[in-house]
From Swiss-Prot:
<dbReference type="GO" id="GO:0009325">
    <property type="term" value="C:nitrate reductase complex"/>
</dbReference>
<dbReference type="Pfam" id="PF01568">
    <property type="entry name" value="Molydop_binding"/>
</dbReference>
<feature type="binding site">
    <location>
        <position position="794"/>
    </location>
    <ligand>
        <name>substrate</name>
    </ligand>
</feature>
<feature type="binding site">
    <location>
        <position position="175"/>
    </location>
    <ligand>
        <name>Mo-bis(molybdopterin guanine dinucleotide)</name>
    </ligand>
</feature>
<feature type="binding site">
    <location>
        <position position="83"/>
    </location>
    <ligand>
        <name>Mo-bis(molybdopterin guanine dinucleotide)</name>
    </ligand>
</feature>
<dbReference type="Pfam" id="PF00384">
    <property type="entry name" value="Molybdopterin"/>
</dbReference>
<dbReference type="GO" id="GO:0043546">
    <property type="term" value="F:molybdopterin cofactor binding"/>
</dbReference>
<dbReference type="InterPro" id="IPR009010">
    <property type="entry name" value="Asp_de-COase-like_dom_sf"/>
</dbReference>
<feature type="domain" description="4Fe-4S Mo/W bis-MGD-type">
    <location>
        <begin position="39"/>
        <end position="95"/>
    </location>
</feature>
<comment type="similarity">
    <text>Belongs to the prokaryotic molybdopterin-containing oxidoreductase family. NasA/NapA/NarB subfamily.</text>
</comment>
<dbReference type="InterPro" id="IPR041957">
    <property type="entry name" value="CT_Nitrate-R-NapA-like"/>
</dbReference>
<dbReference type="GO" id="GO:0042128">
    <property type="term" value="P:nitrate assimilation"/>
</dbReference>
<feature type="binding site">
    <location>
        <position position="81"/>
    </location>
    <ligand>
        <name>[4Fe-4S] cluster</name>
    </ligand>
</feature>
<keyword id="KW-0732">Signal</keyword>
<keyword id="KW-0500">Molybdenum</keyword>
<feature type="binding site">
    <location>
        <position position="53"/>
    </location>
    <ligand>
        <name>[4Fe-4S] cluster</name>
    </ligand>
</feature>
<feature type="binding site">
    <location>
        <begin position="243"/>
        <end position="247"/>
    </location>
    <ligand>
        <name>Mo-bis(molybdopterin guanine dinucleotide)</name>
    </ligand>
</feature>
């Protein structure tokens, strides 16, 4: 094969980037990277985590044949992690779904029937009948949708419009409820606005990194490579890692801390106390920009109201707080002494002091990173609030190199679930359904009758499971998520509702996942670059990509499914007469005409697409649907601190971080000179709050919902591994990734294994009060739990670890605690 100098340079760049990450480039990429004439390359964000790496996608003869890190992408600078290099293969699993499948017996739908291929028209016929029957007999609260932080921005926006405006049901929630809801509520309580104030550029300027429940080495490996480079190139940089078990991020740690589950709350309050006792408060910042409040306590665990823990709670679900003085706050945290903290957490005193000194040192720029260890926590909102306290006490916030940073796990948990507002309580740009002014803004922009959007918060993810089981939610559509494997307490709270004859379950998925196989109707879905899309990553960076290949068979994008299904409903079938009377011109129109084919959305012609540019949805409809939806959605945030750039700018750029004002992105929010919403002379302004001040909350330690006892004597924590992403529905179909980690194992301390007569490689039954699974004992390897705790990843469909987990949630965010429940082991 003859290579040009340019091709040779590019091939070497790919190989060098892979070597830097300790990775090998897949053979297909090595073979084709030099064949520039034969392969068409275009940019896209990676399909996996919330880091938002940029990749170059190589297509040839209608297939994705190669992928490489994009050297022009500022996030990853040409480097991919092991999953990123195998992106092409996620789309071509042997069991890819290519036509709708309905459970049928004797030629018609039957709950106990076999999956049978049908047409899209037949699929929509059945869905139409089920939706209309439920709406007529029981109203909008009987239907629901479970979406995703993997939806594109316009897919999430279209879904939210269809349910909240079209069907008048707020029973739509994303799987980001399971991963980012506590971060959202934490941001809103402390700052009045969602999402981090900093960016990834902080990494190269920080003096210290503190990881709170974040195994970045495996879950955010590209960011970890940048942290590693910073640490190894500067001897004065410090890394502290906190977790309930030892993992790969500990290899870089100067201070690796293992604490008793739930006791991170104690450590956070201890550090606040240390800062105060050592006169390390930034008095100028604190006096000008911070308020103090005492939060309600004993708030329960988000379980069913009949559960003993909920009955015993004094303030179940309370988000209340009251002002407090600094002296009262000082007295509150004073109880968290070094001695008490060491006793409650099991952490040596010297390690606690070293950690506290990082925050207290005025000359150290500190970044706090966290993911699921904080968020999947029955006091996850509190944990978020408490880490903000440390940065607000010291003024280490909204400046280069320092600040609190909540990392996301999905590619558009920020851009779609949070910013678009696909949660059951949210609307675009941090607006909420309970606020009449916010509903009015949306109704006017969408040109629908006043009062269309319900004021009542819809069912969140766990509540949807309970409502299905109780027969209150009867038609349920899930998209771009595998909740039958990923959600908690499968046996008791999810499977019964899905298989209840009263309920009809639709799953849109590219593969026959656990969720798809438990459904009644499966709709084949287009993936990644088989559609035009947009994601928003953890640093507020919005990134676009173009459709680069077509989906196989009859697979259709989630956007196509939503828009086409909306044609089946006329306004008089979904809206009461009193609403129609307010806008009689909408009578007789379909929801497609009212929500999507509006003058506002349909005004961008197909001529804006290049003649050879793929865009299946727009070409079928006759207008540039994605641009119309995006520009309508972006209107909500412009001028309100959520400013997005014009649509076309994103196709030219490698992403832009909002707010984007006058063509300039924002790296650090809330600080003068960095944020266009902070005026000269203000210094800092947390403009999500009416008075421009952030809030420090006094919040105590409260125990976990379930802890080990004499019978169930071990903590169980669940999570991920580097090679697989979430439930493995994509990565397990990549042969190389599957071989690297073919099945889940139970990581256990050698002494705990020995005490139970277990050896590495033995089969073991893991049992909780809710279910049991068979796994494989692992006493070595990357994850090393302390005595008393075991760890299992949840990627393996043959080992449904969420049969074991408890459906306890943070009462404020409704996010599930997947990190703490009690189990026992039985040798098989």
């Amino acid at each position: 094969m003859k290579l040009s100098r340019r091709s040779f340079m590019k091939a070497n760049a790919v190989a060098a980037a892979a070597a830097a990450a300790g990775l090998s480039v897949p053979g297909v990429a090595r073979a084709v990277v030099g064949q520039q004439e034969a392969i068409k390359w275009d940019k896209a964000p990676c399909r996996f985590c919330g880091t938002g790496c940029g990749v170059l996608v190589g297509t040839q003869q209608g297939r994705v044949v190669a992928c490489q890190g994009d050297p022009d992408a500022p996030v990853n600078r040409g480097l991919n992690c092991i999953k990123g290099y195998f992106l092409p293969k996620i789309m071509y699993g042997k069991d890819r779904l290519t036509q709708p499948l309905l459970r049928m017996k004797n030629g018609k739908y039957d709950k106990e029937g076999e999956f049978t291929p049908i047409t899209w028209d037949q699929a929509f016929d059945v869905m139409e009948e089920k939706f209309k029957t439920a709406l007529k007999e029981k109203g909008p609260e009987s239907i629901g949708m479970f979406g995703s932080g993997q939806w594109t921005i316009w897919e999430g926006y279209a879904a939210s419009k269809l349910f909240k405006a079209g069907f008048r049901s707020n029973n739509i929630d994303p799987n980001a409820r399971h991963c980012m809801a506590s971060a959202v509520v934490g941001f809103m309580r402390t700052f009045g606005m969602d999402e981090p104030m900093g960016c990834y550029d902080d990494i190269e300027q920080a003096d210290a990194f503190v990881l709170w429940g974040a195994n970045m080495a495996e879950m955010h490996p590209i960011l970890w490579s940048r942290i590693t480079n910073r640490r190894l190139s500067n001897q004065n940089v410090t890394v502290a890692v906190l977790s309930t078990y030892q993992h790969r991020s500990f290899e870089l740690a100067d201070n690796g801390i293992i604490f008793t589950p739930q006791s991170d709350l104690v450590i956070l309050n201890y550090i606040a106390n240390y800062i105060i006792q050592n006169n390390a408060i930034n008095q100028d910042f604190f006096s000008k920009h911070v308020n103090l409040r005492k939060g309600a306590t004993d708030i329960g665990y988000g379980l069913r109201p009949t559960h003993p823990l909920e009955k015993a709670a004094k303030n179940p679900g309370s988000d209340a707080s009251e002002p407090m003085s600094f002296e009262d706050y000082k007295a509150f945290v004073a109880e968290y002494t070094l001695e008490k903290t060491a006793e409650m957490t099991g952490v040596p005193k010297d390690q606690l002091e070293q950690l506290a000194q990082l925050y207290a040192d005025p000359n150290k720029k500190v970044i706090s990173y966290w993911t699921m260890g904080f968020n999947q926590h029955t006091r996850g909102v509190w944990a978020n609030n408490l880490v903000y306290n440390l940065h607000l006490l010291t003024g280490k916030i909204s400046q280069p190199g320092c600040g609190p940073f909540s990392l996301t796990g999905q590619p558009s948990a920020c851009g779609t679930a949070r910013e678009v507002g696909t949660f059951a309580h949210r609307l675009p740009a941090d607006m909420v359904v309970t606020n009449e002014k916010h509903r009015d803004i949306c109704e006017k922009k969408w040109n629908i009758p006043s009062g269309t959007i319900p004021a009542k918060i819809g069912l969140h993810a766990v509540a949807q499971d309970r409502a299905l089981k109780d027969g209150k939610l009867n038609v349920y559509w899930t998209m771009c998520t595998n909740n039958m494997q990923a959600g908690p307490n499968i046996n008791e709270e999810r499977m019964p509702g899905w298989r209840d004859p009263r309920n009809f379950i639709i799953v849109s998925d590219p593969y026959p996942t656990v969720s798809a196989l438990a459904a009644d109707l499966i709709l084949p879905t287009a993936m990644w670059v088989e559609k035009e899309g947009a994601y928003g990553n953890a640093e507020r960076r919005t990134q676009f990509w173009r459709q680069q290949v077509q989906a196989p068979g009859e697979a259709k994008s989630d956007l196509w499914q939503l828009v086409q299904f909306s044609r089946r409903f006329k306004t008089e079938e979904v809206w009461p007469e009193e609403l129609l009377a307010k806008k009689p011109e909408l009578r007789g129109k379909t929801l497609y005409e009212v929500l999507y084919a509006t003058p506002e959305v349909s005004k961008f012609p197909l001529s804006e697409l290049a003649e050879d540019q793929l865009n299946d949805e727009s070409r079928e409809l006759g207008f540039y649907l994605q641009k119309g939806l995006f520009e309508e959605y972006a209107w909500f945030g412009r001028g309100h601190g959520h400013d997005l750039a014009p649509f076309d700018d994103y196709h030219k750029a490698r992403g832009l971080r909002w707010p984007v004002v006058n063509g300039k992105e924002t790296q650090w929010r809330y600080s003068e000179g960095n944020d266009p919403y902070v005026k000269a002379g203000e210094g800092y302004k947390f403009y999500g709050k009416p008075d421009g001040k952030a809030v420090i909350f006094a919040l105590p330690f409260e125990p976990a919902a379930e802890a080990p006892d004499e019978e169930y004597d071990l903590w169980l924590s669940t999570g991920r591994v580097l090679e697989h992403w979430h439930t493995g529905s994509m990565t397990r179909r990549v042969p190389e990734l599957h071989r690297a980690f073919p099945e889940a194992v139970l990581f256990i301390h050698p002494l705990d294994a020995k005490a139970r007569d277990l050896r590495r490689g033995d089969k073991v039954k893991v049992v909780s009060r809710r279910g049991e699974v068979i796994s494989i004992v692992e006493t070595r390897g990357r994850n090393r739990p302390p005595q008393g705790l075991v760890y299992m990843p949840f990627f393996d469909a043959a080992q449904l670890v969420n049969k074991l987990t408890l459906d306890a949630t943070d009462p404020l965010s409704k996010e599930t605690d997947f990190k703490k429940c009690a189990v026992k082991l039985e040798k098989v």
